[in-house]
Amino acid sequence: MKIPFVEPVICLSVFAVTLNSPLTTQYVYRRIWEETGNYSIALESNTSECAKNKSSPIFAFQEEVQKKVSLFNLEMDISGLIPGLVSTFVFLSHSDHGGRKFPLILSSVGALANSAWLCLLSYFALPIQLLIASTFIGALFGNYTTFLGASFAYIVDQCKEKKQRTIRIAIIDFLFGVVSGLTGLSSGYFIRGLGFVWSFLIVTVALFVNLIYILLFLEDSMKESSSQNISVSWTETFKNLFHRTYMLFKNASGEQQSLCCLLLFTMITYFFVTIGVSPIFVLYELDSPLCWDEVLIGYGSALGSVTFFSSFLGIWLFSYCMEDIHMAFIGTFTTMVGMAMTAFARTTLMMFLVRLPFLFTVMPLSVLRSMISKVVHSTEQGTMFACLAFLETLGGITAVSTFNGIYSATVAWCKGFVFLLSAVLLLIPAISLCVIKYVSRNTGSYVLLIQEESSEDTSDR
C-alpha cells in the first residue's frame, strides 16, 4: 500500500541532519585536538582541556586547533560545492518529468552512504581527511537542499488548492521546529551517553529507515508524468528551464524587473550571512572563554531552533498591523543586534541571552519569499522558485566556505570578528530593503499582482 505523505520522510531527515551536524563538528574537533598534540579530551567533558588563561600553554594550542578545524571544514565545504550545485540543479529540474521520488531517493542514498562512512571512520579511527572524499562523493547524489526541494515540490503537486498547500507547508515548518529543537537538545546526551560511534550509527539507521519508506511506501506524486519520461531528454529539460528563466525577466516591465532583482538580491545576501555564520557558533562555543561541553552545545542548538516558532508567530501577529517589508526590517535588525552581541559574549549566561535577538531570524526569509511570489505571474512561480533554489544552493555552500575561512584567519587575534563582520554585512540587505520600499512606493506596491487580478476579473465578466 502506497502512502501519499512525505511528512515522515522530512521528520526523519531533519532528525538525522540536526544530530549529524554537531556530531561531525565535535568529532573533527576532538580528532584534530588529539592529532595536533599530546593532549586528550575526556568523553564526559571538554572543559578540562579548555584553557581560559592566556598564559597557559594549552591556550595557544587550542587557538591552533580552532584554526585547523575551521580550515578542515572549509576544505569539506569546497569539496562538495560543485557536485552539490550540479546535482541539485539536475535532479530537481529532471523531477518535473521523472517524478519527485527520483531526487528523494538519490539524496537519501548519498546521505546514508556518508553517515555509514562516518561510523566506520570513528570506529576504526581512520584519517579524517577521508571525510573530504566522502563529502565529494555524497554531494554527487544531491544534498539537503535537493532533498527539501523535492519534498516541498511533492507537497505542491498534491495540493491543488492554495489554502490546503499553505496548511501543509505550515505543518512542515512546525514539524521542522519540533524535531530539530528536540534533537538539538538531546545531541549532547547522545555524545556523552553513547559516544560518537553509536551516535553516528543511530543517524545511519534513521536514514536507512527513511530510504526504505521512500522506496517501498511513498506514493509518487506525478503518476501522469511516467509517459513523458522517455520522450523528454535531459538536454531538452535544461533548454526549457533556461528558456523559461530568460523569458521570466524578458517579459517583465522595467519596474517589475528592478523590483524582482532587488528582492532576489536582498534575500540572497541575507541568506548568505545567516547561513554562512551558523556553523561557526559550535566552534565559538567550544573555544575559551566559554569552553562549552557537548550538553551545553545541545542546549544552544535547541534554543536556535526556537526561531522557527517565534518567526512564524511574529509573521502571524505582525501581519495584522504592518506591511511585509516592515516585518523583514524587524527580522534583519534584530539579527544584526544578535550578531553584534555574540561577538562580545564571554559567559554562558550571555551566550544563552544572545539567542533572544535571533527570535525573528527566519522571518525575513519567509516574508521575502512571499513578496517575490507577488511580483511574478502565477504561471511563472515554479521558474522563479527554481532560480531561488539554485541561488540558495550556490550561496549557502559558498557562504559556509567563506565564513570558515574568515574565522580561521581571525580566530587568533579576535574570535568574535566573524560575528561583527556578519552584523556589518547585514547592513546590505537592510539598505536594499530601503531601496525596495522607495521603488515600490513610486511604482505601486506589487504592481503585477494587481494587474493580474484585474485582468482575471475582466476575463470572468
From Swiss-Prot:
Catalysed reactions listed for this entry: estrone 3-sulfate(out) + n H(+)(out) = estrone 3-sulfate(in) + n H(+)(in); 25-hydroxyvitamin D3 sulfate(out) + n H(+)(out) = 25-hydroxyvitamin D3 sulfate(in) + n H(+)(in); cholate(out) + n H(+)(out) = cholate(in) + n H(+)(in); glycocholate(out) + n H(+)(out) = glycocholate(in) + n H(+)(in)
Write one Pfam family the protein is assigned to: MFS_1
UniProt GO molecular function: symporter activity; transmembrane transporter activity
Compartment annotation: Lysosome membrane
Gene3D superfamilies reported for this sequence = MFS general substrate transporter like domains
Q: Name one GO biological process term.
A: vacuolar transmembrane transport
Membrane topology term reads: Multi-pass membrane protein
TM ranges: 71-91, 102-124, 134-156, 171-191, 196-216, 262-282, 295-315, 325-345, 348-368, 383-403, 416-436
Tell me, in one coarse class, where this protein mainly resides.
membrane
Q: List glycan-bearing residues.
A: N38, N46, N53
> What start and end residues bound the annotated signal peptide?
1-25
Q: Iron: is it a keyword of this entry? A: no
Question: Coordinates of motif Tyrosine-based lysosomal-sorting motif in the sequence?
Answer: 446-449
Keyword vocabulary terms for this entry = Glycoprotein, Lysosome, Membrane, Signal, Symport, Transmembrane, Transmembrane helix, Transport
Q: Which residues lie on this side of the membrane: Extracellular?
A: 26-70, 125-133, 192-195, 283-294, 346-347, 404-415
Q: Name one GO cellular component term.
A: lysosomal membrane
Q: Which residues lie on this side of the membrane: Cytoplasmic?
A: 92-101, 157-170, 217-261, 316-324, 369-382, 437-461
Q: Which family does this protein fall into?
A: Belongs to the major facilitator superfamily. SLC46A family.
* Record protein name field: Lysosomal proton-coupled steroid conjugate and bile acid symporter SLC46A3
